[in-house]
Amino acid sequence: MGPKKLASVGLFVLLTFTYGARAQQSGTSVAPSPVWNDNSLIAVQKTGGDPARPGDVRIEFYGHDAFKITSPVGLTVLTDPWRNDSTGDYPKWFLTEFPAIRVDIVVSTHAHFDHDAVDRPKGLVVLERLVGQFKLGDIEITGLADKHKCEPTPPDKASTPADLHMENTCPPNNVIGLDNAIQIIETGGLRIAIWGDNRAALDASLDHYLRNVDVLVLPIESVLTPVEVDAIVHKYDPKAVIPSHYFVKGLTTETSGVESPDEWVNDQKKGHHAEVRRLESADLTLNTTELKGSHHRIYYFGSHFEKE
């Protein structure tokens, strides 16, 4: 994708630096500001925070792979805001534009249009394809560099110029759009891994980061196959799984080719005897108590998504 103007000019951070002091016992909430600026970030820089300290973590689904995560002290992280392709290589995927919501941190996994609209939300800190560690208050984000899933399209099956180009760009000689950085967000004593569109068999050196994550957000059906998803869940053994990157009624177009994970979700309940919670809104609150003793519990937002 081409370069974009970012809404947070002047507020970038060095991705490999730790930002903000760690307070051993900080329960201070971030006070909302009537003016949208970095006052709240300055405040939390002073008070610090501990990502490992248990507390309520709010997760709101904005469709596709976009989730707004609110920490116990009130800091917000938005993952992978989406847009429609501007090159003409792909049909329209989304029926609307991503809402211009205010968040403290925006982070993306890779440079594809359905994940990289970092200029749409009003973010104070923008972390495009973060690799390394970033800390602010009671949030710590770790980006793991790996590769996007890639399956070359045979020339006789290609339907777009992008399909033809893909044949010669799969890793390791890939274009930047097929780099992917899994993002692990730690807050409230929970570790939440945003897979992005990463390949199923990632570099073995990264395995220890993902083993026993609390929540694993996986692109089911439209990127990873059900067999690949099951293998990933078995390998890393999360307490909970949240499907992402799927067809959402009222948001995703039929021409996108993005599919529903319903079959996989149903199979988990019947064939794997997993606990499935079909959510009745786009809003979920998790904490260490809620997930205690949980084993691969599925939280499925379905077609509920936030619009503003």
Where are these regions (language model features)?
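Sec/Tat signal peptide C-region and signal peptidase I cleavage site
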Residues: 19-23
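Binuclear metal-ion centers of metallo-dependent hydrolases, dominated by the metallo-beta-lactamase
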Residues: 177, 240-308
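Active-site environment of divalent metal-dependent phosphoester hydrolases
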Residues: 84-88, 111-117, 150-151, 200-203, ...
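Bacterial N-terminal signal peptides that target proteins for export
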Residues: 1-9
